[in-house]
Amino acid sequence: MGRAREMGWMAAGLMIGAGACYCMYKLTMGRDEGNELENEEEDEWDDEQDLDEEEADIWFDFTAMARPWSEDGEWDEPGAPGGTEDRRSGGGKANRAHPTKQRPFPYEHKNIWGVQSFQTFPCALNLTKCAFSQGKKMFTESTIAGFSLTHNVSRHLSSLSVVGSRSPTPQPTVREKALDVPEHPNSSIENQDQIKMYIDEVCRDAVFCCCKSFLQQAGLGLLISMTVINNMLAKSLSDPKFPLLSEGSGCAKVQGLEAQMSLPEKPVLAEEVLAAQMLFSFMCLFTRSGSREMLVEAISP
């Protein structure tokens, strides 16, 4: 009986010892496995960081590319060049900012044709000696810059440079095209000041090219358009250098008279024109033989 009890206690002790040893073994092995898992996770993290650094050099946010530029030409939304954008990284990790590089052409340019580049267009006209080619280019140049600029602004940029560079040219067709390009040169005082620099050439074209009625019409059209906000035409008609009605051709006389008769609709210009020049113009037409028909044609509605 006593012997059996001793054997029972010995078996229980062995089982308890074996269990304790097994627990110590599991704790030791589990700690090693945990360290290995942590090392593997750290290696994976380092690999992902290396991949993210390489990816940042070539990664583009295509949705941000489709967004419009702001008014000042800056990218002020996520995905801007030189900026950052948050996006989910792989493996459910925390959000990290990924820098993006400057977008290549054409995204880095808002306007293909700018004011600076368009001002080089008259250089091409100077290299072309053919009168027909020059006139053709002048006629079409105002619509070329419309790709990036408004139509009116582009016409001003082209017409002002053309009036200055082409008026002294000997070809009447080229001068006619140069004077005929401006549609609304009165949009700014700067534009008018630039045209005033070449107003003498315009007046000479309208007066002394007696056999070139179309050139005279173009010159008169430019002068009349300048009277919208100032009295340039009134001063030009009163100037001795602009004796259109006394020395111009028949067509030019009629047009000059019509221009003077339309000026009284602008009260600011009426007094200066009607004071002397208008009366002198009527007297010239009445006293010369063959001029009364021109007067009737000019005053008829």
Swiss-Prot record:
- Record keywords, A-Z: Membrane, Mitochondrion, Mitochondrion outer membrane, Signal-anchor, Transmembrane, Transmembrane helix
Residues in the Mitochondrial intermembrane compartment per record? 1-7
Task: Give its localization.
Answer: Mitochondrion; Mitochondrion outer membrane
Region Disordered: list its residue ranges.
70-105
TM helices/strands, residue ranges? 8-25
Membrane topology type, per the record? Single-pass membrane protein
What role is this protein assigned? May regulate the dynamics and distribution of mitochondria in neural cells.
Family according to the record: Belongs to the eutherian X-chromosome-specific Armcx family.
Q: What is the official name of this protein in its record?
A: Protein ARMCX6
